[in-house]
């Protein structure tokens, strides 16, 4: 990252940086010098009053030296891509680490002085049973991370997993099993003191992800790097995904990006698909009157069906609604 890129994207330096999230790929594979340069460049260009600086890491990249260096740079939160505590399932998704390394990474991070740790988990692997998933949750709880994000395994087009699915080499987990696993996730973590504050995110009291919460609450953000997105309430922009093209543009003093103007309907839909993911739901008083009325009309059937609830001018998903959140949000959208 170069200071020129930041200055070109936001030349007036009028924003104050509240959170920094270094992710999108695998930033822990960068050298310590590269990580230092990224963080120091942000601090040099923008006024920073950062409450949270997060770096994504793979467990096998974690060392005491790395954690000590990033802590001294101001990093106070690590998001660790554990995915599963099953060595067999880790091999299936071609991860380099094993379960023992994942547990050791959490201990190393804490010993090196960063106490705010989030771990990512996946469920819905081929042939994974409810007992297997419970074992993963139990292993995670033994480590007592401050935050847990959990998602069902996705077969994204263009990936090796998708190719295996298309060639009938694996069978996708059925919806009923995924639903049972999600229910187990909610019940197990809630019983162990974790707050379920967003569809896929759980935390101990006081440890919500500040950066992600800002995104879900329609806060403007700046994105740097190939394929990164930026948003300022009025426009959304995205950098070219091709790394060579992106680097070439930056070295020439240009930004390889496109943008779109956000009209009122699109902004309303954006609020629905982000705020509705949170336990607070959509604050209807944030909406213009015509959109507030539209939301209430559109929500009636799902309120009657027990998928949504209306309380204190907030429209939010019920527990039943969490299982079909995409459908419920689609019912509320304009575009």
Indicate where each model-derived feature is located:
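C-terminal scaffold of the Radical SAM
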Residues: 1-9, 15-291
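Auxiliary N-terminal substrate/complex-recognition segments of SAM-dependent methyltransferases
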Residues: 4, 33, 296-297, 323
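C-terminal alpha-helix/helix-terminus motif
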Residues: 10, 46, 328-332
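Short amphipathic alpha-helical interaction segments
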Residues: 289-304
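A short, conserved structural fragment
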Residues: 303-313
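Minor-groove-contacting beta-hairpin "wing" of winged helix-turn-helix DNA-binding domains
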Residues: 314-318
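Short, amphipathic alpha-helical interaction segments positioned at domain boundaries
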Residues: 320-335
């Amino acid at each position: 990252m170069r200071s020129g890129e930041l200055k070109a994207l936001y030349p007036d330096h009028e924003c104050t940086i509240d959170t920094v999230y270094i992710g999108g790929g695998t930033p822990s594979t960068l050298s310590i010098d590269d990580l230092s340069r990224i963080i120091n460049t942000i601090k040099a260009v923008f006024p920073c009053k950062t409450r949270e600086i997060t770096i994504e890491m793979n467990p096998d990249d974690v060392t005491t030296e790395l954690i000590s260096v990033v802590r001294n740079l101001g990093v106070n939160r690590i998001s660790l891509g554990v995915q599963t505590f099953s060595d067999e399932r880790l091999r299936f998704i071609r991860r380099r680490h094993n379960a023992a390394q994942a547990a050791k990474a959490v201990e190393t991070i804490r010993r090196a002085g960063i106490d705010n740790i989030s771990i990512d988990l996946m469920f819905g692997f081929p042939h994974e049973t409810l007992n297997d998933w419970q074992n993963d949750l139990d292993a995670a709880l033994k480590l007592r991370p401050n935050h847990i994000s959990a998602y069902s395994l996705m077969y994204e087009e263009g990936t090796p997993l998708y190719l295996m699915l298309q060639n009938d080499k694996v069978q996708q987990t059925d919806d009923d099993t995924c639903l049972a696993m999600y229910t187990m996730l909610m019940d197990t973590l809630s019983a162990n003191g974790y707050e379920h504050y967003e569809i896929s995110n759980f935390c101990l009291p006081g440890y919500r992800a500040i950066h992600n919460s800002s995104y879900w609450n329609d806060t403007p953000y700046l994105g740097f790097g190939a394929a990164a997105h930026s948003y300022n309430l009025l426009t959304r922009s995205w950098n070219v995904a091709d790394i060579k093209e992106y680097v070439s543009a930056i070295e020439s003093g240009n930004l390889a990006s496109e943008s779109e103007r956000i009209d009122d309907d699109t902004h309303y839909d954006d609020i629905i698909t982000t705020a509705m993911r949170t336990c607070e739901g959509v604050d209807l008083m944030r909406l213009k009157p015509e959109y507030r009325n539209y939301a209430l009309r559109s929500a009636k059937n799902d309120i009657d069906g027990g998928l949504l609830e209306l309380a204190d001018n907030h429209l939010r998903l019920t527990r039943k609604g969490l299982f079909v959140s995409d459908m419920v949000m689609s019912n509320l959208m304009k575009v």
